[in-house]
Structures are given as C-alpha cells and as structure tokens.
C-alpha cells in the first residue's frame, strides 16, 4: 500500500520493470499472497503453474515463520491445486491476449497480474511476441480493459541494458 500510495487504484495499470532475474515475479507473488481479500488472476507466459506453486509455497512458509517463529514443517501454506488455483489466486499459463480476456470473463478477478508483458501477443498485430508493436498493442488493450472494467492490472516487464522496456527495436 505504501509503495503505491494507498494501494491498487481501480482501473489502473502498474508497470513493474527491472532486469531479468532481479525478483519482479517473486515480489509480485509475495504481495498477492497477502491480498487474501481479492480474487486474483495471475497470468504467466514464462513459468508453469508448478514453478509458481513452488515459489508461492516457499514464500508462504517464509512469511509464516517470520510472523510466528514456527518451523516450516508445521505450517499450513497456500498450495496450488492440480487445476492451478490458490485459494484466492488463479494461475493461467497463457500468452494469447484474446484467450486471456476469455479467461478473465470466467474468473471475474478483482486484480490481474501479467508476467511478463513481453510474452503476450495479440492476433491484431502481425509480429512476434516481445516486439515493440506487440508490447504496445497488448499494453494498450490491457489499459483499455482496466479503465472500462475498473479492474487494476499489474504488468511485469523486463528492461534492457539501456533501462528501457525490453523488446526488439
């Protein structure tokens, strides 16, 4: 809440950018694990649901140990079901924007995470995922969706050596 000046603003997009491997996905997952009062759709274009589950379990155990000093062996932690859903988080491994929008209609989330924007593509643009035109169009479509639906979106994006959003120039 403090970082975002009071929390997620309805209808907004928050871009979390950084170098690959710096911890953007882990930070985001750690944050949404604590948002148990919201239905969250976590869209992953890079990792499998199993990989996300392993990280979430590790984070949940660490957080619980910090809270009450319990050993990791005795903790009840968030666990991923075989369908890919936490209690309040649904994980969708998909890179096609149109399919993501269809899934949003089914899940009716209150927050959406896209990890990462460079992996998402739309049929509206004839270029490869991660290209500047794909990143721009997908981000613009997600912004339009966020504004019309009131659902906040977190976009995770990689930056290059120059410090700009990654993607072919």
Range-by-range predicted roles:
Residues 1-7:
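Pre-Walker A adenine-sensing motif
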Residues 9-11, 19, 29-31, 35-68, ...:
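Conserved inter-motif catalytic segment of the P-loop NTP-binding fold
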Residues 27, 54, 165-169:
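Generic recognition of short, well-ordered alpha-helical segments
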Residues 24:
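Conserved lysine of the Walker
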Residues 4, 57, 147:
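Short polybasic/polar patches that bind polyanions
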Residues 136, 140-169:
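Phosphate-binding/switch region of NTP-binding enzymes
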